[in-house]
Amino acid sequence: MQLGYNEIMIVSKYFEDINDFINLEMGVKRFQGNMERFHFNPIPLNQYSRKLFPNIETFHIYNEEDKIFKEGRIFKYVIWYDVSYSKYLEEKEEMNEYKNIEYTKYDRKKYGNTIPIEVNSLGINCFYECTSLQTINIPTSVIEIGDWCFYKCSSLISINIPSSITSFGYGCFYHCGCEESIKKNKTIPEYCFKEYFYEEIR
């Protein structure tokens, strides 16, 4: 069974280097023009590689240091690196799409204890020693809780932990008010209830 144009395009989406795209087209004649079929950039681009993807309409920015192009047919940007909720609010009207929005300690102090539904992660120390916090609802959009996120939230008596969360930070529930109740959830790692990293290797 031979791969067709659509199949090879799907496969090449997972290439990590521009040379892989070039070698594909040079090595297999019938796949020449593969890069021209892309309407988004599957990898970060520089001044040279940008010319090989002439039909991009949606530009993906994978790392903060990536070169950004604004010419041609590009009308939308998709940002993959972590962006604070504050920055997201500042720039969301610019036809951008943010894949990893972090609710930081600064955001929490500015916008309050209610976690916005756009948020994908809770930053390090986000609710650190927030002793006034009694209940918290974590949206299902959240997939990560940072280190010491709810550290010593002594008044916290109710928290929902959605199954969407796949990454828990060290000490994120250390000495919070409902620590014993959270410990009953066996899917949550023990290091979430330790204060320091070195406690793991004692």
Name each model feature, range by range:
Residues 1-30:
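N-terminal Skp1-binding subsegment of the F-box domain
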Residues 46-53, 64:
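Long, charge-patterned amphipathic interaction tracts in eukaryotic proteins
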Residues 20-25, 39-48, 78-121, 131-144, ...:
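Structural signature of tandem-repeat unit edges
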Residues 65-67, 73:
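Intrinsically disordered, low-complexity regulatory domains of metazoan transcription factors
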Residues 18, 33-38, 53:
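N-terminal export/assembly leaders
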